[in-house]
Amino acid sequence: MLLAKDSVKCDMLDALERAAEFSGVNVGSFAIMDNHLHVVLQVPASTETIPEREVLRRYCALMGGKAALRLEERICGLRERGDSTTAEAELNRIRARMHDLSQFVKTFKEEFGRLFRKRNPFPGTIWEGRFKSTLVGEAEYLRRCVAYVESNPVRAGLSECAEGYAWNTVGAAKRGNKFAKRCREWLMSVICPSDGDSPQIKNVFLKRIAQISGGKILGSAAFVSNMLLRFSDKVRSRSAAARVVEAIGFASHGWKLAARLRVAA
């Protein structure tokens, strides 16, 4: 399996952190498996123009200090030559990659590909197809969806408990990973753990999540109805296309590796 090595999983976690910081998304949960990745995240809407200093800070988080310095010098050089229009256009090009789900996925894939190829020269395609997404509604559903993601290693037989796995949020946070801790902190700020559900209800819900394919809406009847009404011109049934729902709210994503890489050493 391509991701079987801890060094590759470490690169993937690094890429996820960099891409999230650059894109301005809130990651609440993740599980890096041997041949795919699950992420629960929120893409906050950007209501105001992102300040230039913030653009440079995020660019630095993704590309590193030297690249950010070169960008800043290029912007300053354009302005000194009286070409403020080009300078602003370049900043807007970078802003357009932020607070957007598809752009976040693209950024993440590119960053992981760069890190992976530094260790493992590989000319082929790493990822297979488009990512799959599910729009998640109320905190109750978000909490249970997170439980499903975190328990992936247990169902796969990789660990006896979620906390025992090093490459999901709870396990990485327990081992001191700062990014995983921030993910947990953000998640706890929007949902509160609850033990109100019986094991039977939890099991039924987890099976329901497992059966959901990309592009579905997961939430209460009212939430689903509201989303379908909001996109009534684009949605023909209760199964909403991924491209329709990816711009709003919470989403849970799983990315598959290309078939030929799933059994790679």
Language-model region placement:
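Short Pro-Cys-Gly-centered "Cys-loop" motif that presents a nucleophilic cysteine in a tight turn
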Residues: 1-34, 42-265
